Every structure is written in C-alpha cells, then in structure tokens.
Amino acid sequence: MAEVRPPGLFRRAWRWLFSPSPRWSVFALLAIGLLIGAFGVIGTGVAVAVTGTSEFCGTTCHSHQQFVYPEHQQSVHYNNRTGVRASCTDCHVPHHYPAKLIYKAKAGMRDAWAELRGTIATREKFEHERWRLANNVWDEMRENNSENCRSCHNPTAMSSAKQSEDAVKQHKKFAAGKATCIDCHTGVAHKEPEEPKEPAKAEAPK
C-alpha cells in the first residue's frame, strides 16, 4: 500500500486561504473587514462634516452660544464686503489628516469637560478666562506659523498698493519668516482680551 504523503506547502496555503476555520474563509473575513472599514471611513467623514460647522461649534455648548459665537458673528471673518466667511474650524482646527481628527478629539473632550464644570458658564467667568484662553490659541498659531490663516491668506498674492506702509513692512517680515500672522492680527474674530493688570493669577469667580 502506497504511503499517503501530506499535502505540500502550496496546497496547504490554498486550503487555508479559502477555509482558515471551519466557519469562515479568508475572503469572507476580508469582505467583513472591508465592510467595517468602509462604514468607519464614511462615519468619520459624516462626523467631521457635522461637527465642523460654525453652527455646531457655536450652539452646542451654552457658553459658546452665549459669549463666543455672537462675537464671531460680529467680526470681519463672518460679515464682510466680499462675502467670504471663515468658519470656526477654518481658524481653529488643522486642515489635514490625521492632525484634524486628533485635534477634534482632544478639543472635543476638553471643551465638553470645561462645559460640564462650568468653567466659562457666566459672563464674569468668561471674562476672567478670556486672556488665558486667547493666549492658548495664539501660542498654537505661533507654533504652526499661523497655518490656518495662511490656508486663506497668501502674502504673495497681496497687493502692496492697497496696503498701508506699515502693513507692507510687516508682510515683508512675514514673507522672510521673521513674523507670523497672529503677531499682529489678534482680535480679528473675537473681542481683543485685556491683559490682566496684576501679574499674579486672580481668584476665579464662583
């Protein structure tokens, strides 16, 4: 009686490809994985789109609806002669992936926790925190060389004939890498905060 030889490597791989387990083939598992991945990509895209509107940012939190969003609606970034409107995410959220998703997740959790704690729940609390909050944003912008500003404003496309002498001088510094947008343009989308007179941190209102 001839000896039965075990199947070769190629045959074993072929069998495993179609039946890695008694219940599922590799192709079935791949199809399920692709389906889950597709739902994940579509779901993420929908979530980013829904949470990326100014209406969502400005009205979801009570404090934003009461204090932050109305200021933005009165700014030149909301109403202007050209009709070009900058949304909250245009200025505050990175425009590229995966940085956009990471920032939105971190900022969402941070803002939700602050809202639950009532950090800026009243006008008095908001004004007390305004300087600190503004500087946090300005520091972020300086770190990335005002990347979000430059996604709309291109210094090489600016007409020096339509700018003041000082603006032309400052924009030359910017083009040379010696300055960044936020060094000069603070208070363009929200009220300019007043620097605290006392260097020591004042007690937060209760």
What are these regions (language model features)?
Residues A2-K206:
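Short sequence/structural segments immediately N-terminal
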